[in-house]
């Protein structure tokens, strides 16, 4: 088993050694799989006023043993985040080459919202699969391989990471947020004919083919991007999977940004994109 751990994860040699040690059935149960050579995951990270968190988040993203294109979009941060990012970008120029991680940095000249930052990141992304990653440490990048498995195995075009499935650890927080999320997800399901448990999740993973179909049509600037993406994925009848994820939610004192106005906007977007493109 120790020999298996010394190999590069998700390579044919790594998988063959684990299959020999654990058996094929156990490997499937554990979600172990082979990633094709030269395959790249684009990680789109919208950032706004996260000077105390983005570095920890980026360290976690970089540590995931996958070849990644990390697209960081600063949405005109005013707390020093932009200065930190630009310094980090400059340091990368003289740092040793990182075989696992390539970086792109995009800076908005005015604050436009998460949806606008995600759309900018989508335009810059060039990987085989794209995932959205918030910069606030609520979602755990170590779960990328689990989320990617249905796509790599050819079963799914899109994967949603659900905070309400399975037995992954969750921080217990606001009841009314939970209730609002369930209401919005249920209403979205009524319009899309999907049976999601967490439409508002940050973790939406999609193939390049899906991205090329829906990205040019996205319009929302703020948190309405979540129901808009969901509606357009459903309209194109892409194969959608849901996977359980952990969640460590923040309080408003810790920097949580979504508010009740965004809930009403999400309601509008569910109806709007449920009825027309």
Protein language model regions, located:
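N-proximal low-complexity "stem/linker" segments adjacent to membrane-targeting elements
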Residues: 1-60
């Amino acid at each position: 088993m120790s020999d298996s751990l010394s190999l590069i994860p998700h390579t044919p040699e790594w998988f063959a050694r684990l299959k020999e040690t654990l058996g094929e059935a156990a490997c499937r149960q554990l979600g172990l799989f082979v990633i094709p050579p030269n395959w790249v995951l684009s990680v789109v990270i919208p950032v706004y006023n996260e000077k105390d968190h983005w570095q920890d988040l980026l360290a976690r993203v970089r540590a995931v043993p996958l070849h990644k294109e990390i697209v960081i979009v600063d949405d005109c941060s005013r707390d020093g985040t932009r200065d930190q990012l630009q310094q980090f970008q400059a340091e990368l120029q003289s740092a040793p080459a990182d075989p696992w991680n390539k970086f792109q940095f995009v800076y908005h000249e005015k604050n436009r919202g998460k949806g606008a930052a995600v759309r900018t990141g989508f335009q810059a992304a060039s990987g085989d699969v794209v995932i959205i990653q918030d910069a606030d440490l609520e979602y755990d990048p170590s779960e990328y391989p689990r989320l990617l498995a249905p796509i790599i195995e050819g079963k799914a075009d899109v994967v949603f990471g659900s905070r309400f499935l399975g037995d992954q650890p969750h921080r217990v927080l606001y009841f009314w947020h939970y209730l609002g999320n369930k209401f919005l997800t249920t209403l979205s399901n009524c319009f899309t004919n999907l049976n999601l448990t967490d439409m508002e999740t940050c973790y939406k993973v999609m193939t390049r083919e899906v991205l090329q179909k829906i990205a040019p049509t996205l319009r929302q600037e703020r948190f309405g991007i979540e129901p808009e993406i969901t509606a357009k994925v459903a309209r194109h009848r892409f194969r959608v999977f849901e996977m359980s994820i952990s969640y460590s939610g923040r309080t408003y004192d810790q920097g949580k940004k979504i508010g009740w106005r965004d809930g009403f906007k999400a309601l509008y977007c569910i109806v709007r994109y449920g009825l027309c493109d």
